[in-house]
Each structure stands twice: as structure tokens, then as C-alpha cells.
Amino acid sequence: MTSAAVYDGLIKDILHAFKYHNATFYKAFLGKILFDELSKEEVACDIVSFVPLHWTRMIFRGYNQAALIARELSRLLGLELRFDVLRKSRRTLPQVGLGRALRKKNITGAFCASGVADRAVLVVDDVVTTGQTAREVSMALKKAGATRVVFASVGRMLI
């Protein structure tokens, strides 16, 4: 799992505005700092995807912040961005404010994947806290036949 920055200070403010206040103009900056971090290591992936939102949250927010970052990152990496490989199969509570045990219970079994057999997938998210979402997404992709899953986020909370 790779994260570009600790989730505090300016990065926290930018990600909060990006996610909750329609500040989508930050997408290029966020994609670039994640690209810069990933460029420090070998990221041998075939495709890029992102942590999906449930369709009801997508309608409410109007966009998926992870998808916007993934679009920028895929362009910089020269990799195909796939919107169809991950799906959130049920609604969950927002993870914000939940403790570790509730986060795990809340997100367990919430994702399904397809179209990734024999593919290495780079999955993008905005922030990682406990890593439970990353684990669940990785399990869904592996179950669908992905050979490798690399999880990358802009921010990483220190808990």
C-alpha cells in the first residue's frame, strides 16, 4: 500500500474540500502527488481502477473523488482507467467517525469485482485510515482473478 502524504495539515484541508465541497479543481494536483510517490517504486500494473461509491452516494455527491484522482493518475502512468471492474454491492455507513471494529464490520463484503482475470490492478482511493477498505477491495479483485493488487491513496491517517 502506498500513500503520498500523511493525512493532516494542508493535505487534509485539500482532500476535505475536494471530497465534501466540490473542489474538483484539485484533481490534477492530487493525481500528480500520487504519481510522484508511485514513481519511487516499481508499479507493474495493467490497469487502474478506484474504490467505488454506492450509487446512492454517487447521486448525492455528484462525483467519485477517487475516480477523479484515478483518471489523472492513469493519464500520467499511461495506463488504462477501468470504471467497470469494481462495484459497491451494498450501501454502507460512511467510515468517517467509526472505530476500527465498526469500520471492519461496516465494509466487510461490500465490494464485488469482475473483468480482472490475469490482470494486475492499481486501485486508487483518497484516504486510508485502518486499511480495511483496501483489504476488502483487494479480496474482491483477487476473487475475480486479479494476479496482483496495488493500493494507492493520497492521504494516510496515522492512528
Region spans (language model):
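Conserved PRPP/pyrophosphate-binding segment of the phosphoribosyltransferase/PRPP-pathway fold
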Residues: 1-123, 130-159
